[in-house]
Amino acid sequence: MFLGPVSGQSKPTVEDLFWLSGCWQGRQGTAVVEEMWSKPAGSTMLGLGRTVRNNRTVSFEFMQFREQDGTLAFLPQPQGGAQVKFPLKESSSARFVFENLNHDFPQRVIYERKNSLLVASIEGTQNGKFSRHEFVMRKVRCN
């Protein structure tokens, strides 16, 4: 599998993330982590993520994959706050790496399909040290 910089010949689109549409769920210790993604339409995919611990939502995030200015970008809004732009840095058919080196943390957001699993990762420098958090999820029925 080739993984390289995004080239002008075959720019990825939101259609390449179609496999992500639907509902995903995993565990982080005692917490349940969920992401729900729409099907691609209008050069955009809309998503919602939340983490529930002890029957309480402890974090949530509105998200988009959007084609902007000829580039695919990941646009999260943690806790419903200000939107942050992470342009696509590199991709393959099953792995998409979005990067914003000017963001505090994370600087990279990675979505990867591994067989039937979704592995979503955030990584970068935090307090002067490299940090990586991985969220492994399975596709579940949307309610």
Language-model regions, residue ranges each:
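Bacterial N-terminal signal peptides
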Residues: 1-4
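N-terminal helix-cap/turn-to-beta initiation motif at the start of protein domains
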Residues: 9-23
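A short, compositionally biased
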Residues: 20, 68-70, 115-116
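Central antiparallel beta-sheet cores of small beta-barrel/beta-sandwich binding domains
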Residues: 27-102
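Periodic aromatic/glycine/histidine/acidic cluster detector
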Residues: 33-36, 109, 121
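Aromatic-rich beta-strand edge motifs centered on tyrosine
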Residues: 36-40, 66, 111-115, 137-139
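Edge beta-strand at a domain terminus
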Residues: 83, 88, 93, 113-143
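Charged, amphipathic alpha-helical segments
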Residues: 104-107
